[in-house]
Structure formats: C-alpha cells, structure tokens
C-alpha cells in the first residue's frame, strides 16, 4: 500500500468517527449563531439537547435534522425573531420557548410528534407553522403569547393541557379523544371559541373566561368539571354520564341554561353559584346521587332534580326569589333521610350564598345559623378545584 494511503485511511476513519459522534452528544449543544445551526444539518437524527444562546441575534434554522432525541430550548432572548426546522418530524423531548420577546415565527412544517410543548412570554408570536399538525404530545403548556389560534396543534391524546393568558386567541379546537390528567383553558380572550368534538373521556376539565365551550361527545369524567367566569349563555354535556369528583358552575354572568341530560352520578360536590341569569335549573333529569354536598345559590325560581335520591353531604339551596315549592320537594328527601347531612333551603333572601353562609331575609333579619359541612371528601374536591384556579 502506498505510504500516502497508510496515512490517509486512518485519518479518514478518524474523521468519520468524529462525524458520527457529533450527531450524538451527552451534554447540551448550545447554538450561538446561524453557522452553528448549519453545522448540524448533516445529522438526520441528532441525539442530545439543543439550546439557543441568550445572546443569539440570528434567525436559527435547524434544517436537515429529522429527529431530535432531546430537548429544544430557547429562553431569555430579546433579539431572536425566527426559529425553523424544515425537516423535523419528531422531537422526543420538550420544545421550550420562554421569554423570546421579538420572536414572531416558529416554522416546523413537518413536525408531528413532540413529547411536550412549553411556550411562555412570546408577545409577538401570532401563529405557528406546524403545517403537518402536531398530533402527538404528552403535555401542552402555552401561556402569555399573541397566538390567534392553536392551528397546527391537533393532539389526539394528552396528559396535560394548560392554555392561559393568551389574550388574542380566537379559537381553540382539537381532536382530543382523552385527557389523562387535566385540561385547563383559562384567562385567554374572553370570546374564545372552544371546540373539543371528539373528547370522550377526561380526568379534570376547567374552563374559565371562555366565550363558548363545546364537548358533545364527552361521556366520563374521572375528576372534576369547573366552569368559571365564562361568557356563554348555555352549556351542555349531552352524553356525560358520571363525574368522579366535583361539578362547579360559578360566576358565569350570562349563563341561563345548563343541560346534563344523561348525568346520573356526581361523586363529590355539586356547586352552582353566582350565575345571575340562571333562574331555572332543570337540566339534571337523570341525576340520582351526589356523594358530597348539594350547594346551589343565586336567583333561581325553580330547581328540579326529579330522580335524585341520595345526597351524602350537606344540602344548601339559597335564592333571592321564591322557592317554596322547590324546598318542599327537597324537604321530603331530607325527611326520608335521603339527604344525610345538614339541610338548609330558603328563598327571598337578600344575599343568597354558598354553604356555610347565613343569609339575610328580605325583611332584614338573619335566617339562622349556617349548616355545617359533613361531607369532608366533597369539601376537599372543591378546595382542589379552587387551587387549580389560583395556579
């Protein structure tokens, strides 16, 4: 073998080994500029995490990489405007973009699979270019962006969704079939239209400050359902049969109709309060049992749950209007010991309130001591939901 070949072949082998190693790294690879990103283009699969440096001012294009077996992180950068990955279809870690105040474009047209998405403080990001649609992710957390919609994120199954404080978002629509931990949509554009047409099963659902919510296929909730401060006039869960924890419908100022035609069981508390236009509650025709407290207050003239035969906790119904007939029906349940806890049912009060509240009658006198709570589990259920809202 010529002497030059004896030198060249080992050198070529070493270069090949070095190249292979450059696509697999144990430490996080930090991208300082566009050139660093271009240097990874020959890696169709990159094993390791990539971080974009806080001082980067270039647009970053991670073209060539089809699979990133790690995280993609960019944070605390006030200069970067565009992040793209034209060939990326799978990201096995987290896409974490936080505090990128000038970022206006995230372009990954082939991306479909991500372990988790976490976006926060992206005030100029109005849309996502996920043309192929991300349909697999375990967690989605999007807060404080300028997104107008979630077009491009169309998850089928998820552990956790938290979408909050996105003041411009007009629409949230996903093909979600089940939510194993929680879905929270809170404090976005108060007119946002929420559509979850395929959602059948979930653990916990919380909707706060939404313009409309559609869950036509929802059948089972293992946890709680909370509707707070929404703007819609009606809410329906036409196929929901059971709720594993609490149902809370609170402070929805335009709400005049609620319909749960197939709901038979609420394991913890039923709480309906401060919905000023909700004067009739007749949307629970099949409800048989409440494992915690029955707690309804407001301006109602009529409350009917014709098949209810078990309330394990306290019964509280307070209204500013006349509910004499309603109270007579529920007094019958109490007399038959089908309501196990304390009982309070009263109308024509100035300040109807939730259980534990001692209202003032329209004549100006107090109505008597408030009933104590006997359903500890029910109380814990509502406390947990309150904690979610404070998060």
Label every PLM stretch briefly:
Residues 2-10, 378-382:
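Sec-dependent signal peptide recognition
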Residues 25-39, 46-61, 69-103, 110-125, ...:
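Concave beta-strand-loop units of leucine-rich repeat
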Residues 366-391:
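Cleavable C-terminal sorting propeptides in eukaryotic secreted/cell-surface proteins
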Residues 218:
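Rossmann-like adenosine-cofactor binding region
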Residues 2, 12-26, 387-391:
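N-terminal signal peptide
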Residues 14, 341, 382-384:
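Extracellular/surface-exposed low-complexity segments
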Residues 348-373:
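Low-complexity, Pro/Ser/Thr-rich intrinsically disordered segments
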């Amino acid at each position: 073998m010529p002497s030059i070949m004896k030198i060249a072949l080992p050198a070529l082998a070493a270069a090949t080994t070095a190249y292979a190693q450059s696509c697999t790294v144990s430490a996080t690879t930090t991208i300082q500029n566009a050139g660093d990103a271009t240097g990874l283009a020959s890696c169709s699969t990159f094993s390791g995490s990539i971080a974009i440096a806080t001082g980067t001012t270039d647009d970053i294009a991670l073209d060539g990489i089809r699979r990133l077996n790690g995280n993609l992180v960019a944070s605390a950068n006030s200069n970067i405007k565009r992040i793209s990955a034209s060939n990326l279809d799978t990201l096995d870690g987290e896409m974490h973009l936080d505090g990128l105040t000038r970022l206006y474009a995230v372009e990954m047209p082939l991306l479909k699979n991500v372990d988790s998405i976490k976006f926060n403080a992206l005030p100029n990001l109005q849309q996502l270019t996920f043309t192929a649609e991300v349909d697999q992710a375990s967690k989605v957390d999007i807060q404080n962006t300028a997104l107008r919609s979630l077009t491009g994120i169309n998850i089928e199954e998820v552990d956790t969704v938290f979408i909050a404080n996105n003041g411009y978002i007009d629409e949230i629509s996903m093909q979600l079939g089940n939510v194993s931990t929680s879905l929270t949509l809170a404090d976005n554009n108060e007119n946002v239209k929420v559509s979850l047409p395929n959602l059948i099963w979930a653990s916990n659902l919380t909707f706060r400050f939404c313009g409309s919510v559609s869950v036509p296929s929802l059948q089972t909730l293992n946890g709680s359902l909370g509707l707070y401060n929404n703007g819609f006039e009606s809410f329906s869960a036409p196929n929901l049969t059971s709720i594993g924890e609490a149902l809370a419908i609170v402070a929805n100022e335009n709400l005049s109709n609620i319909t749960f035609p197939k709901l038979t069981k609420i394991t913890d508390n039923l709480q309906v309060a401060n919905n000023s236009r909700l004067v009739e509650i007749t949307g629970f025709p099949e409800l048989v049992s409440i494992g915690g407290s029955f707690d309804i207050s407001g301006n109602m003239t009529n409350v009917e749950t014709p098949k209810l035969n078990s309330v394990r906790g306290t019964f509280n119904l307070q209204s500013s209007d006349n509910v004499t007939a309603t109270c007579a029906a529920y007094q019958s349940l109490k007399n038959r010991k089908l309501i196990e806890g304390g009982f309070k049912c009263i109308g024509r009060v100035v300040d109807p309130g939730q259980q534990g509240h001692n209202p003032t009658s329209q004549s100006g006198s107090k109505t008597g001591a408030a009933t104590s709570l006997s359903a500890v589990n029910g109380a814990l259920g509502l406390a947990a939901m309150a904690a979610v809202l404070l998060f």
